[in-house]
């Protein structure tokens, strides 16, 4: 079985521009720093709240749901695992589209379910037909690693096609123009999954959550690990949620840099699929040279993400960093252009 392979993590002090894991380039809210300063180390001998009630209440108030409609986990990876563990027994069907987050396929393999893989291709405008008899379907919106996003109305059409649970993986929703939260109110089979890793600059804290109908969230609570969110994580995320001003400012900066960098790259002749996430899928003019492009960037101390998968071998996924980081990347793209021009 092929497992999930994360992006390369350089050692401390290594002089790379790290743009391969879709981390937020800005620090967390100052309120997080204050919580860390005030945390009593003696408290770490105690187990955390097993149901993360304060977090769920804060998230519910922020997003317009009750705490009973929310479950928290050790990152959205944990939430995705809980979903498969809860709703798809061995031999039943888990559906997803590719290209997409590789963990979907891995989770299906681990739990012995049948992976039903639907292929989508550029320009990614036409949604796939969803089989009626699936137990569970994962749809990443915005898509990773490509970055395109569907409007809520189009996602609703897809969700209505299946009798199973339709999961909208919104790991990058805060960077997009639209999200699918309204579908949780309107459709009984929709669950939305989110994370604080990207938007709140808390990838190291590991907190993901699902929002859905109470009856489905209650089932998920039955299969989650007993203490799956640490005391420290619950404290720092609660603090970050109180600081929406920092969130909005950083999201705005990333979106602005994304737009500028996309325009400049395209003007050089690089191909970019319009992105609604905190990354872009960047392709040199010459097709089929994604791995060489990745290696050329790596040699110049720029870490991107290459996927040796169908539909992804023409380019790399590149996180949007700070403006000065992306200016350096743009300079490298200019230097590399003669090597990757179409024949």
Where does each model-flagged region fall?
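PLP-dependent enzyme catalytic core of the Aspartate aminotransferase-like
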Residues: 153, 296-300, 305, 309-343
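Conserved PLP-binding catalytic core of the aspartate aminotransferase-like
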Residues: 255, 267-300, 316
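N-terminal "arm"/small-domain region of PLP-dependent enzymes with the aminotransferase-like
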Residues: 1-46, 132-133
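Phosphate-binding glycine-rich loop
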Residues: 53-93, 111
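Active-site phosphate-binding strand-loop segment of PLP-dependent enzymes
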Residues: 116-174
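A short linear hydrophobic-aromatic micro-motif
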Residues: 68, 192, 268-271, 302-307
């Amino acid at each position: 079985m092929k497992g999930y392979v994360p992006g390369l993590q350089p050692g401390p002090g290594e002089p790379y521009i790290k743009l391969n894991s879709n981390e937020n380039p800005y620090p967390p809210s100052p309120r997080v720093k204050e919580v860390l300063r005030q945390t009593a180390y003696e408290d770490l001998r105690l187990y955390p709240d097993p149901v993360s009630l304060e977090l769920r209440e804060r998230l519910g108030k922020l997003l317009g749901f009750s705490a009973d409609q929310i479950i928290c986990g050790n990152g959205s990876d944990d939430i995705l695992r809980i979903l498969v563990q809860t709703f798809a027994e061995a031999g039943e069907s888990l559906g997803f589209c590719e290209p997409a987050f590789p963990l979907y396929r891995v989770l299906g393999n681990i739990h012995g379910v049948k992976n039903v893989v639907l292929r989508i291709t550029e320009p990614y405008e036409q949604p796939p037909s969803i089989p009626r008899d699936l137990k569970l379907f994962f749809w990443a919106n915005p898509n990773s690693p490509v970055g395109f996003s569907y409007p809520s109305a189009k996602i609703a059409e897809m969700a209505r096609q299946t009798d199973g649970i339709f999961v909208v993986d919104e790991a990058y929703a805060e960077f997009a123009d639209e999200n699918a939260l309204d579908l949780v109110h309107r459709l009984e089979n929709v669950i939305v999954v989110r994370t604080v890793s990207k938007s709140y600059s808390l990838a190291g804290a590991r907190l993901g959550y699902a929002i859905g109908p109470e009856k489905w969230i209650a089932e998920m609570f039955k299969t989650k690990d007993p203490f799956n969110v640490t005391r420290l994580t619950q404290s720092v995320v609660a603090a970050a949620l109180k600081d929406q001003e920092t969130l909005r400012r950083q999201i705005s900066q990333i979106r602005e840099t994304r737009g500028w960098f996309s325009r400049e790259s395209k003007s050089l002749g690089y191909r970019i699929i319009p992105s609604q996430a905190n990354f872009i899928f960047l392709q040199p003019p010459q097709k089929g040279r994604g791995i060489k492009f990745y290696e050329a960037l790596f040699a110049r101390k720029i870490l991107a993400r290459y996927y040796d998968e169908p539909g992804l071998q023409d380019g790399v996924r590149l996180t949007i960093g700070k403006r000065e980081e992306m200016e350096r990347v743009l300079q490298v793209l200019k230097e590399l252009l003669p090597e990757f021009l179409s024949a």
